[in-house]
Amino acid sequence: MHIILTGTGLVGAIALDAMLQESSIDKITIISRKPVPQAEGQSKVEVIIQEDLSTYSDETLAKLKGAHGCIWTAGPPLMAVTRQEYEYGHIDLPVKAAKAFAALNDKFNFVYVSHDGCHDTRAVYIFDVKARAEEKLFQLHHDPSKRLEIKTKGGIEEQESLSSFVLYCIRPALIDYSTHDAIKPWLKPLPLAKKWTNGVILPLYRFLGLTSIMGTSQELGQAMKDLVISDGRDVDVAGASPEGRCLGAVGMRNWTQARNESPEDTVAV
């Protein structure tokens, strides 16, 4: 099975680590703006260096032909770009990729990494951006009955669904990777705010048992990997979104537990 990955930050590293351990995945193509040290020496990984993720050449699409799915983790940090660039990176680019990748196979799973609570906290800019991205991507999902209620001010342009496009959204909140040693060598030095979160906030939340807004990197990795290799059916686990296409922190925890206990009871893989 051939899977595409975009994004080389924390979530991308988590996704790659999970897929490297999955025997059913025999090829991983990473589309990245720069080399990926984590992929070096991994025989089933190919890295395509591409600065512009808005368009894909015939040569690149030929290399991707037959892929089963994509985990999309790419997106610039807010502090590094303008708001226009941020929206382009988190909304427009995944939508463009979704349209291009949908033609790679008869059924193509697209796992978009969003954020937990994004539709309930749209007053927060970064959450609103993720919610808008989900609204647009769900327009493309092969089953129009799964489309989200459009709450973006002014609405969005309606688009036809793509018969081959199968969407899942993964919605992490705080990610605890304190015990995920396999990815630590590949992570960039943390800015002060992230160090504060990892050193103070996460331990405090663990102590207080506030698990509804945090999850482990292992849970996140398994959920992303399982959905991208799945047969595309709805997710049937406590904590999944009402339409059965999205998992937040609680859903991912329940998903991991269900998969470990009874793999046949969740999405077939």
Swiss-Prot record:
<feature type="glycosylation site" description="N-linked (GlcNAc...) asparagine">
    <location>
        <position position="254"/>
    </location>
</feature>
<feature type="signal peptide">
    <location>
        <begin position="1"/>
        <end position="15"/>
    </location>
</feature>
<keyword id="KW-0325">Glycoprotein</keyword>
<comment type="function">
    <text>Part of the gene cluster that mediates the biosynthesis of the lipopeptide antibiotics leucinostatins that show extensive biological activities, including antimalarial, antiviral, antibacterial, antifungal, and antitumor activities, as well as phytotoxic. The function of lcsT within the leucinostatins biosynthesis has not been identified yet.</text>
</comment>
<keyword id="KW-0732">Signal</keyword>
<dbReference type="InterPro" id="IPR036291">
    <property type="entry name" value="NAD(P)-bd_dom_sf"/>
</dbReference>
<protein>
    <recommendedName>
        <fullName>Leucinostatins biosynthesis cluster protein T</fullName>
    </recommendedName>
</protein>
